Every structure is written in structure tokens, then in C-alpha cells.
Amino acid sequence: MKKLLSIIALNLLAFNSFAVELKTTNPYPNLMPAQVTEKVNSMGVRKFIISTSPNVDGSTWDYILSHISSGNIEWLRIVPILSTGVDAGSAEDLSTAVATALPKNASGVLSVLNDSNVSISTESVCSLPFYQGTEAELNQYVIDSIRALYKNKGGGKCLQKLIETTGNSKSFSEGD
């Protein structure tokens, strides 16, 4: 009986440790854009971004970026707010997320670009800010983005940057 109780106690302790770890890596599960805005207003944008653990895989920051990457307009609308509190690493993350949304919602992406803010400038977002993916995936992204931008009246500057970057790039090699 004592052995059974000690096993149960250890299992509860292990589960509790797992739950605590889960909570520290994602303190805001199921976060919506309106809640992000509320948190930013109450905490300040920089403190909020720090609280999302931008350097931890599976964090709230990753959750936010995945929704921005989807091209959902509500998530894209909070990009200008978030961009004012990013550091170098999270700025790159944000640029990449916005760039990923480009072929999915070019109008939404173009509406949040701001050339006076490096992390969401045309230069950063429209110049293939990717470090991962295969050549086929990158090629498909370029084709889909060109199509999306070509169909959008305001897409000329981003389209020009995308084509310029593609034209100036060297051949792709996995593992570089």
C-alpha cells in the first residue's frame, strides 16, 4: 500500500512539474488579437513580448507568429503594435511571419508595411527573409507571392523588391 501511495505521489508530482513547465512556456494559451492588444496596453509592448518567451520553441510568441503567418487580417492588424517592442531576434521572427502571410493575404500584409520601421518594412518583408525550407518550397513561395502581389494595386514596391531579391540570389543549396 505504501508503495502504491508513493507511486501515485510521484506521478502527481511529475504531472504537476509538467503542467508548470507548460504554463511557463505558454502563459497565454488560445490568445486572440484583442487580448494581445489588451495585454500590450496594460503591460507595455516590450514587457508583453518578453513575457511571450520569444526564444523558446512552442512559446506564446510562436503561437502569435503562426497566426500572423496564416494571413488572418485580425492577426495582421496587431503587427504594427508588436513591431514597436521587438528586439533584433523577435524583429526577424516578425518579419518572417509577415512575409509568410504575403501569398495568403497580400492586401493585409501590404496594409501593415511601414518603411520607417525596419521589422515591417518593404525591405525586410519582401526580400525573402527565410532561413528554412527547400528550394521547391521557396520557389513556390516566390511564384505565389508574385501572383498575389501582381493582382494587388498597391503591390508594386513589394513585387519589385521580391523580384530584385530573387534575381540577385545565388542558387539554393540545402545545408548552407
Predicted regions located by residue number:
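N-terminal signal peptide c-region/cleavage motif recognized by signal peptidases
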Residues: 14-17
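Non-catalytic all-alpha helical scaffold/repeat segments
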Residues: 21-176
